[in-house]
UniProtKB/Swiss-Prot annotation:
Keywords, comma-separated and alphabetical: Chloroplast, Plastid, Ribonucleoprotein, Ribosomal protein, RNA-binding, rRNA-binding
Cited Gene3D superfamilies: 3.30.1370.30, 3.30.1490.10
Molecular function as annotated in GO: rRNA binding; structural constituent of ribosome
GO-annotated biological processes: translation
Pfam families: Ribosomal_S8
UniProt-recorded name of the protein: Small ribosomal subunit protein uS8c
Subcellular location, principal: plastid
Role this protein plays: One of the primary rRNA binding proteins, it binds directly to 16S rRNA central domain where it helps coordinate assembly of the platform of the 30S subunit.
Assembly and oligomerization: Part of the 30S ribosomal subunit.
RNA-binding keyword on record: yes
Family label: Belongs to the universal ribosomal protein uS8 family.
Superkingdom of source: Eukaryota
GO cellular component: chloroplast; ribonucleoprotein complex; ribosome
Amino acid sequence: MVVNDTVADMLTRIRNANLARHQIVQVPATKVTRNMALVLKEEGFVHNFEQMGEGIETHLMISLKYNGKNRQPVITALKRISKPGLRVYANHKELPRVLGGLGIAIISTSQGVMTDRQARHDGLGGEILCYIW
Protein backbone atom coordinates (compact mmCIF):
# COMPACT_ATOMS: atom_id res chain seq x y z
CA MET A 1 0.00 0.00 0.00
CA VAL A 2 1.37 3.42 -0.97
CA VAL A 3 1.22 6.04 1.77
CA ASN A 4 1.80 9.72 1.04
CA ASP A 5 2.30 10.85 4.64
CA THR A 6 4.51 8.28 6.38
CA VAL A 7 4.71 10.31 9.62
CA ALA A 8 0.91 10.48 10.00
CA ASP A 9 0.68 6.78 9.12
CA MET A 10 3.24 5.92 11.81
CA LEU A 11 1.44 8.01 14.45
CA THR A 12 -1.94 6.47 13.55
CA ARG A 13 -0.56 2.93 13.74
CA ILE A 14 0.99 3.61 17.16
CA ARG A 15 -2.23 5.26 18.42
CA ASN A 16 -4.38 2.31 17.24
CA ALA A 17 -1.97 -0.28 18.69
CA ASN A 18 -1.97 1.58 22.03
CA LEU A 19 -5.78 1.63 22.15
CA ALA A 20 -5.88 -2.11 21.40
CA ARG A 21 -3.07 -2.73 23.98
CA HIS A 22 -0.86 -4.45 21.39
CA GLN A 23 2.71 -5.21 22.43
CA ILE A 24 4.28 -4.62 19.00
CA VAL A 25 3.31 -2.42 16.06
CA GLN A 26 4.64 -2.69 12.49
CA VAL A 27 5.45 0.55 10.65
CA PRO A 28 6.89 1.07 7.13
CA ALA A 29 10.57 2.03 7.46
CA THR A 30 11.81 5.34 6.06
CA LYS A 31 14.63 7.61 7.25
CA VAL A 32 12.14 9.83 9.08
CA THR A 33 10.20 6.99 10.76
CA ARG A 34 13.48 5.33 11.85
CA ASN A 35 14.71 8.59 13.37
CA MET A 36 11.34 9.23 15.04
CA ALA A 37 11.39 5.71 16.53
CA LEU A 38 14.90 6.39 17.85
CA VAL A 39 13.69 9.62 19.50
CA LEU A 40 10.71 7.77 21.05
CA LYS A 41 13.09 5.13 22.44
CA GLU A 42 15.54 7.72 23.84
CA GLU A 43 12.66 9.60 25.50
CA GLY A 44 11.26 6.40 27.06
CA PHE A 45 7.96 6.25 25.15
CA VAL A 46 8.73 2.82 23.61
CA HIS A 47 10.86 -0.14 24.75
CA ASN A 48 12.72 -0.79 21.55
CA PHE A 49 12.43 -1.00 17.77
CA GLU A 50 13.94 -3.28 15.17
CA GLN A 51 14.21 -3.05 11.38
CA MET A 52 12.93 -6.09 9.48
CA GLY A 53 12.95 -7.05 5.81
CA GLU A 54 14.96 -5.75 2.86
CA GLY A 55 14.51 -3.31 0.01
CA ILE A 56 11.01 -1.95 -0.51
CA GLU A 57 9.57 -4.43 2.02
CA THR A 58 11.48 -2.89 4.95
CA HIS A 59 9.48 -2.13 8.08
CA LEU A 60 10.05 -1.31 11.74
CA MET A 61 8.77 -3.45 14.59
CA ILE A 62 8.19 -1.05 17.51
CA SER A 63 7.74 -2.51 21.00
CA LEU A 64 5.24 -0.35 22.92
CA LYS A 65 5.50 0.48 26.62
CA TYR A 66 2.73 0.14 29.23
CA ASN A 67 2.54 0.97 32.96
CA GLY A 68 1.05 -0.96 35.85
CA LYS A 69 -1.30 -3.92 36.13
CA ASN A 70 -3.96 -2.19 34.03
CA ARG A 71 -1.41 -1.74 31.24
CA GLN A 72 -1.91 2.00 30.81
CA PRO A 73 -0.07 3.20 27.68
CA VAL A 74 2.98 5.41 28.31
CA ILE A 75 1.97 7.40 25.21
CA THR A 76 -1.21 9.26 26.15
CA ALA A 77 -1.66 11.08 22.84
CA LEU A 78 0.06 11.80 19.53
CA LYS A 79 -0.75 14.82 17.38
CA ARG A 80 0.50 15.52 13.85
CA ILE A 81 1.40 19.21 13.46
CA SER A 82 3.13 19.81 10.11
CA LYS A 83 1.11 18.20 7.32
CA PRO A 84 1.79 17.86 3.59
CA GLY A 85 -0.81 20.55 2.85
CA LEU A 86 0.38 22.96 5.55
CA ARG A 87 3.98 22.76 6.70
CA VAL A 88 4.76 24.28 10.12
CA TYR A 89 8.24 25.63 10.82
CA ALA A 90 9.71 27.37 13.87
CA ASN A 91 13.09 28.80 14.80
CA HIS A 92 14.71 27.80 18.11
CA LYS A 93 13.08 30.72 19.97
CA GLU A 94 9.59 29.80 18.74
CA LEU A 95 9.77 26.06 19.47
CA PRO A 96 6.73 25.02 21.54
CA ARG A 97 6.76 23.42 24.98
CA VAL A 98 4.29 20.54 24.98
CA LEU A 99 2.17 20.49 28.17
CA GLY A 100 4.69 22.73 29.93
CA GLY A 101 7.53 20.28 29.29
CA LEU A 102 5.67 17.04 30.15
CA GLY A 103 5.43 16.03 26.49
CA ILE A 104 7.78 16.37 23.55
CA ALA A 105 7.66 17.91 20.12
CA ILE A 106 9.58 16.03 17.45
CA ILE A 107 11.41 18.45 15.17
CA SER A 108 13.07 17.78 11.81
CA THR A 109 16.16 20.02 11.68
CA SER A 110 19.16 20.36 9.40
CA GLN A 111 21.03 18.17 11.92
CA GLY A 112 18.40 15.40 11.88
CA VAL A 113 15.23 14.52 13.79
CA MET A 114 15.28 15.48 17.49
CA THR A 115 13.15 16.65 20.39
CA ASP A 116 12.21 20.27 21.00
CA ARG A 117 14.50 20.34 24.06
CA GLN A 118 17.52 19.16 22.07
CA ALA A 119 16.80 21.58 19.20
CA ARG A 120 16.40 24.48 21.65
CA HIS A 121 19.67 23.51 23.36
CA ASP A 122 21.51 23.33 20.02
CA GLY A 123 19.95 26.58 18.79
CA LEU A 124 18.24 24.86 15.84
CA GLY A 125 14.83 25.40 14.30
CA GLY A 126 12.99 23.26 11.80
CA GLU A 127 9.77 21.56 10.84
CA ILE A 128 7.53 20.59 13.78
CA LEU A 129 6.49 17.03 12.90
CA CYS A 130 4.33 16.09 15.90
CA TYR A 131 3.57 16.40 19.62
CA ILE A 132 3.68 13.36 21.90
CA TRP A 133 2.63 13.21 25.55
